[in-house]
Amino acid sequence: MAPRPSRHHVGLAALAVACAAPCASTAVADTAVLRSVADVTLIQPNDGLQYALGAAYNIYCGRVGVNGGGTLRRAVVRFDLSAIPAGSTILSVSYKAYMSQTNSGANDCKLHRMLAPWGEGTSFAFGGGGTSPEVNDATWTYNFWPTSTWAVPGGVFVPTASATKSVNAVGFYTWATVPALVADVQAWLDTPAVNYGWVMVGNEATLETAKRFDARESSDITHHPTITVVYTLASAAPGDLNGDGKINGVDMGILLAAWGGTGPADLNRDGIVDGADLGLLLSNWKP
C-alpha cells in the first residue's frame, strides 16, 4: 500500500493547489500508435529439425493438435519506439492484435517481456507448421539461425506475464494498460538496447489451443500488431511539471496533488510520488 502523506503534506497540497488553480496545467500528454517492426513464431519441433515463420502472414501461440505433433507455438513481437522522444515519461500502454483463426474456445494469451535479442528472416509458409529457416530467422532453438542459440529453447523471457487477455472467437483483442506494460515500454525507451519486445504465450497445457494472429506482413494494415502509447515529454529540468520553463509553487501544487500515486510527478521514476520527488523539485527551484 502506498504511504499516506502527513497532515502537513495534505494541508500544503490543498493550499498549493488552490493558489495554483488559476494558472496551473499539467504537461500535455501525447499519443503514439506504433505497428510491430518484427514478429515471428517460435515453433517447437518434434523431429529434431528447425522450423521458422519469419515473413509469414500470421503468428501463433498455444499448443497445436495431434496432427501437428501436439507441439507449442509462441509469437514474438517487437516495436520501434524511436517516434517517442527520449526522456519521455510513459503513462499508459495497450497492445492490440487481430486473432484470425482458432479451433478452441477462450484461452489466456499472456505477454512476457523478452530478455534476449532475436531475428526475423525471410522464411515463409502458410499455416503454423513453418518451413526451413533462413539466415537470421528465430526458431525454437536459435535466436539467430544458424549462428546463435537461445540460452533456453523456446526463447528467454521474464517468467511473470506483463499482461494477460482471454482470447475466444475471431476478432480484435486489446491487452489494456497495466503497470507492467508501462514499465516494459519505459525501460525500452530509456535503454533501447534492451528492447527485445514481448513473447505471446498461450495455453500450453492443452491440445488444440493454438490461436492464429495476423502479423505485420498481413495485407490488411489494420490487423497488424499495434501498441498505443500515451506519454509526456521530458521537462527542461526535473520539476517543471507544467512545462512553463519555471519550477515554482504551481509545480509543487501539481506534485503534492499527486502524492502517493504515479505519473509525471514521479520525478525519480521509483513508482511513487513522495518526499524524494519533492526534494528533487525543490533542488531545481526556479521561480
How would you describe each model-predicted region?
Residues 1-8:
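N-terminal secretory signal peptides that target proteins for export/translocation
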Residues 11-23:
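Bacterial N-terminal signal peptides
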Residues 28-83, 119, 204-207, 217-226, ...:
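Flexible, small-residue-rich N-terminal segments that precede or flank a structured functional core
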Residues 79, 89-101, 227:
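A short beta-strand element within beta-rich, extracytoplasmic domains
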Residues 98-107, 206-208:
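Extended, low-complexity, turn-rich repeat/linker tracts enriched in Gly/Pro/Ser/Thr and Asp/Glu
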Residues 102-187:
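Beta-strand-rich interaction/scaffold domains
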Residues 178-221, 230-233:
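Ser/Thr/Pro-rich, low-complexity mucin-like regions
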Residues 241-262, 269-287:
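Alpha-helical segments with a strong preference for the paired helices of cellulosomal dockerin domains
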